[in-house]
Curated annotation (Swiss-Prot):
It comes from the Bacteria. Residues 192-218 have a biased composition (Acidic residues). Signal peptide: none annotated. This is one of the proteins that binds to the 5S RNA in the ribosome where it forms part of the central protuberance. GO terms for biological process: translation. This is Large ribosomal subunit protein bL25. Residues 1-20, 185-218 are annotated as: Disordered. Keywords: Ribonucleoprotein, Ribosomal protein, RNA-binding, rRNA-binding. The keyword Ribonucleoprotein applies.
């Protein structure tokens, strides 16, 4: 996982008024915290953060936070990113300070490749899990899990135990649940309770939080 440089400035003011003023100037309020340090209130450039996160999830990026006046960068990941529901502009960022020798719980996206045999026969591909939780050191976090479904027929599935991963990565889940499956058209019309189908995705200071469980230490 690539590490990105991000400038940050200490912030002494709090509250909705100062936060709105920051946003008008092109910045967003942020906070950095971790298990071994006191929280630090910060501001970061909306443009710089947006450029880094372009095309990737907020939980898939590591940062070197270059805080003005600090002796050294602070390595962190986004724990929570609040977004305006209408404009989709960032409102507030929570950065979680990490240690490269301490394992994290992180969500990693699932990417499906190929057109399955079952789809050629009229079946429907259902992606049940679009993210998988892993435990590993920050330097071993996978960018994504790529699953080739070319040989998958109707009624067949890829389970958690089938997902390729390196020895440095653990799945905390004990159940061998279904990640991807191909179902007959009639079955596809009646998804099981609690499952999210291929199109079943849903999208705070007045916003929605992304990556709320992006990184937590074991």
């Amino acid at each position: 996982m690539k590490t990105h440089e991000l400038k940050a400035s200490p912030r002494t003011t709090r509250g909705n008024g100062p936060a709105r003023a920051l946003r008008r100037e092109g910045f967003i309020p942020a906070v950095l915290y971790g298990p071994d340090s006191e929280p630090i209130t910060l501001s970061v450039s909306h443009k710089d953060l947006s450029d880094i996160l372009q095309g990737v999830g907020s939980s898939q990026v590591m940062f070197n936070l270059n805080i003005e006046g600090a002796d050294a960068p602070r390595k962190a990941m986004i724990k929570e990113l609040q977004t305006n529901v209408v404009s989709q502009r960032y409102l507030h960022a929570d950065f979680y300070e990490i240690s490269m020798d301490r394992k994290l719980h992180v969500m990693v996206p699932v990417v499906v490749e190929g057109k399955s045999k079952g789809m050629e026969e009229g079946g429907l591909l259902q992606v049940i899990r679009r993210e998988l939780e892993v435990i590993c050191l920050p330097g071993d976090i996978p960018e994504e899990f790529v699953i080739d479904v070319t040989e998958l027929g109707i009624g067949e599935a890829v389970h958690l135990s089938d997902v390729p991963k390196g020895d440095a990565v653990e799945f905390p889940e004990s159940a061998d649940f279904t990640v991807v499956t191909v179902v007959a058209p009639t079955a596809a019309a009646l998804p099981e309770e609690g499952e999210e189908g291929e199109e079943g995705e849903e999208g705070g200071e007045g916003g929605e939080a992304e990556g709320a469980e992006a990184a937590s230490e074991e």
